[in-house]
UniProtKB/Swiss-Prot annotation:
Its cofactor is Zn(2+). Zn(2+) binds at C110, C115, C136, C139. Binds 1 zinc ion per subunit. GO terms for biological process: 'de novo' pyrimidine nucleobase biosynthetic process; pyrimidine nucleotide biosynthetic process. The lineage of its organism: Archaea, Methanobacteriati, Methanobacteriota, Stenosarchaea group, Halobacteria. Keywords: Metal-binding, Plasmid, Pyrimidine biosynthesis, Zinc. It comes from the Archaea. Pfam families: PyrI, PyrI_C. The keyword Cell inner membrane does not apply. This is Aspartate carbamoyltransferase regulatory chain. GO terms for cellular component: aspartate carbamoyltransferase complex. It comes from Halobacterium salinarum (strain ATCC 700922 / JCM 11081 / NRC-1).
């Protein structure tokens, strides 16, 4: 394929590139990161991009922002094969794969209205990460879908 058959996306000066996101999941990644386009963050999203390794993938570039470990942990739940590239001065300075944590604490809220974490108790939420979802450490509710909607905004 000749170079004029590729759409070129400009490099970012500094920020994060999230690569190898499962095809069709980029918008969920943006939701997890709390980015809705209303901020000043310059964001580039590529969806269903051809990939040798995954056949199709999504990619997200965020100018001027490096992800926290909590954000990477939640991201790993929907994109376990993602790669996080930290860009500084237009070059990849750090490159790492996401690791699914054993526990996610204080990031997600339990959907069970009877859970102690859903009430106004001073209890930090905690979820055990399973192969097919997550389990609340308090009420044992299993969550496997719509994880972005459970992100605690606080």
């Amino acid at each position: 394929m000749s170079s004029d058959q590729h759409l070129q996306v400009s490099k970012i000066q500094a920020g994060t590139v999230i690569d190898h996101i499962p095809a069709g999941q980029a918008l969920q990644v943006l939701q997890i990161l709390g980015t809705n386009g209303a901020s000043d963050d310059q964001i580039t999203v590529g969806m269903n991009v051809t990939s040798e390794r995954h056949h199709r993938k999504d990619i997200v570039k965020i100018e001027g922002r490096e992800l926290s470990q909590d954000e990477v942990d939640v991201l790993s739940l929907i994109a376990p094969d993602a790669t996080i590239n930290i860009v500084r001065d237009y070059e990849v300075d750090e490159k790492r794969r996401v690791d699914r944590p054993d526990v996610v604490a204080g990031v997600l809220s339990c959907p069970n209205p009877n859970c102690i974490t859903a009430n106004d108790e001073p209890v930090r939420s905690g979820f055990d990460v399973l192969d097919d979802g997550m389990r609340c450490q308090y009420c044992e509710q299993i969550v496997s879908e719509d994880i972005p909607s459970l992100i605690d905004p606080e």
